[in-house]
Every structure is written in structure tokens, then in C-alpha cells.
A protein has these predicted regions:
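Short, Lys/Arg-enriched N-terminal segments with co-localized hydrophobic residues
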Residues: 1-16
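Conserved histidines in hydrophobic membrane contexts and catalytic metal-binding motifs
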Residues: 17-250
Length: 250
């Protein structure tokens, strides 16, 4: 009898496994986990980074100095309407895009990336290298180590989608770059290593590896559906296994 049981056990071991409901769920869960598991891990790791690093640090706010208030004593400047009348090519701009600012205490209007003298209405020259250095020196915590003019950028650049040309000023803190619009003279962006890691992980998170801005595309939708099915199949497998154990125990 012992020999018979041993032979039967060996036969059962090499007998093709029947595709029961539990086996089907297990196989499906295994393959789905293989396909979607890597992206699930990337979503988790990137999401963890997003929650651990404060957004203020990513934006480089801790490296910025608040600009000092500069009183403008001459109030004989032109109104926005008068300035627009002097420049018909800028008349397509809406009043919401007009900013009142100053350069060394002199009032100016900013219309997009164009600077206009608020007293005369004349267009001002683009920001010089020295002016860009002065702007960053007044706004950055750290020592300036370099400056260059950025004329164009790639679609995945750390300075994509912003005013060009722009001055890129490097300081000695966290390999930070301060970007100053050559036309507007505004400090438009600060890029640090924390931001670069954020940008890289963001590309992995939304699966847009080129422009890093679009999360409404087919690839991320398919992986999201597969990930949901993976989780649901795992839950179903747990329930089926639990019931099978209950029946065996009974």
C-alpha cells in the first residue's frame, strides 16, 4: 500500500495542472505583475519623492532673497492706455498682461517680455549681461560662478516653455541656475538638483519622456488599467485561496 501511494504521488506531480479558477487567476496575476510591476514601482518611488521634498525647496525658494522695496518718487508716468497707443503692435495684449515694475528706481511697464519706459513710453533695450548679474546678485543666496545667454532649448530642457532668450546665472549653491528674461528682466525660474530629480521622476511618473508635460496619453492609460487589473486579480486570488483553505479545513 505504501508503494502504491508513492507511485500515485509521483504521477500526480508530473500530471498537467488543471486550469482551475485559482490557477487561472494566479497565472494572470503573475503576468500582469511582470508587465505592470516595474511601472507600479516607479509610480511609488516618484510619488514618495514628491511627498518627501517640499515644493518650496524644489522651486529653489530657499535660495531666493526677497527683493527690497524701492520707492518710485516720480509719479508723472504714462497710463497703460497711453503706452499701448504709442505701440500699436502691442495693442493685442490685454490689460491683465501689463505689469508696473522698476529698474533701479525708474518705473517701467512690462508687457509680456517687452520693457517700456513708464515716463516716455519708449521701448528699452534688452537686459545686458551686467544687468542680469546685478538682478541675480540682489535675489540669490550665494556667490555667482558663471553666466551665459540661452538662445534656444530642447523640449526636455530644465528651462522649457519660458521666455527666450534668457540669461542663465549659476551660483555656488546646489548647482543652481537662475534664469533672467533678456527681454523682461524678470527672474523667471530657479533650477536646482532637487528640481532636476523632480523633473526626471515626473517624466517617469507620467510616462512622457520627451516633453514631460502630458499625462493624458495612451501609454499611461494602458498601464494604469493593467495596474488596476493586477491589484484586482491579486484580491480575487486572495479570496479564492481563502475559500479553498476553508473548504479543505472543513
Amino acid at each position: 500500500k505504501a508503494l502504491y501511494l508513492k507511485q500515485r504521488t509521483l504521477l500526480e506531480r508530473f500530471e498537467p495542472m488543471k486550469l482551475t479558477k485559482k490557477n487561472y487567476l494566479r497565472q494572470m496575476h503573475r503576468w500582469l505583475g511582470l508587465i505592470a510591476g516595474i511601472q507600479l514601482l516607479l509610480w511609488t518611488v516618484s510619488g514618495l519623492y514628491f511627498t518627501l521634498i517640499p515644493i518650496e525647496e524644489i522651486r529653489g525658494d530657499h535660495l531666493r532673497l526677497e527683493p527690497e522695496a524701492t520707492p518710485v518718487t516720480n509719479h508723472q508716468w504714462l497710463s497703460p492706455r497711453q503706452v499701448l497707443n504709442l505701440h500699436p503692435d502691442l495693442n493685442t495684449k490685454t490689460s491683465q498682461e501689463i505689469r508696473l515694475s522698476h529698474t533701479d528706481g525708474h518705473p517701467i511697464y512690462l508687457i509680456g517680455s517687452v520693457r517700456l519706459d513708464a515716463l516716455t513710453g519708449k521701448k528699452l533695450d534688452t537686459v545686458s549681461k551686467q544687468q542680469a548679474l546685478d538682478i541675480v546678485q540682489a535675489r540669490a543666496k550665494g556667490r555667482i560662478t558663471g553666466i551665459d545667454l540661452v538662445q534656444s532649448v530642447d523640449s526636455d530642457s530644465e528651462y522649457r516653455g519660458r521666455e527666450l532668450p534668457a540669461w542663465r546665472v549659476t551660483i555656488d549653491q546646489e548647482e543652481a541656475h537662475f534664469y533672467v528674461g533678456a527681454g523682461s528682466g524678470r527672474l523667471l525660474a530657479v533650477r536646482t538638483n532637487a528640481w532636476r530629480w523632480f523633473d526626471f521622476l515626473w517624466a517617469l511618473h507620467i510616462m512622457d519622456y520627451e516633453n514631460r508635460d502630458n499625462f493624458n496619453h495612451l501609454l499611461v492609460q494602458v498601464l494604469a488599467v493593467l495596474s488596476a487589473i493586477t491589484v484586482l486579480s491579486g484580491l480575487a486570488l486572495f479570496v479564492v485561496t481563502l475559500r479553498a483553505r476553508g473548504q479543505t479545513a472543513g
